[in-house]
């Protein structure tokens, strides 16, 4: 009988530990769809390792800890960004930002968009080149840390948004399509204070197939 009781107690304890782990690990660090050195020389292996493995991991860990016991415990990232504020918003925004950021690149990227996204860009800016210039100018002119995004509204209309710190177009009811990170940790090892050079170089590694599917 004693052995049976101890076994039941152990099972309950293990179950509680498992449940706790599941809560803590609601959001996980995304796996990169390429090797850490695959985007060189545009983005170095060292930057990828720190940016993805350290910075993003910290945002994910913080978010998991912050949402425990709140109404956001079972929400999606998009729901959290749309409805939260303060520390939860900041860490959810940065998790969403970086998930979209890292998965929009490919060592075989570059070129230009095609299909519906290409037509929408041409209709809005006149040409892909005009869009690129305005997008880079927006990122260059953003004061301090943040993001520049290509986003669309519910009718498919495109716009360029400048998001301070960890914000995301989702917070304004828009869908993020393409995002460039202008926090210094995203580019300082390679480009120092040359933010425009960093932004212009990123076009060489954009996976337009992935980005186009977001539209």
Model-derived regions, located:
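Short, Lys/Arg-enriched N-terminal segments with co-localized hydrophobic residues
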Residues: 7-24
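Feature for soluble, non-membrane regions of globular proteins
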Residues: 20-215
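Sec-dependent signal peptide recognition
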Residues: 1-6
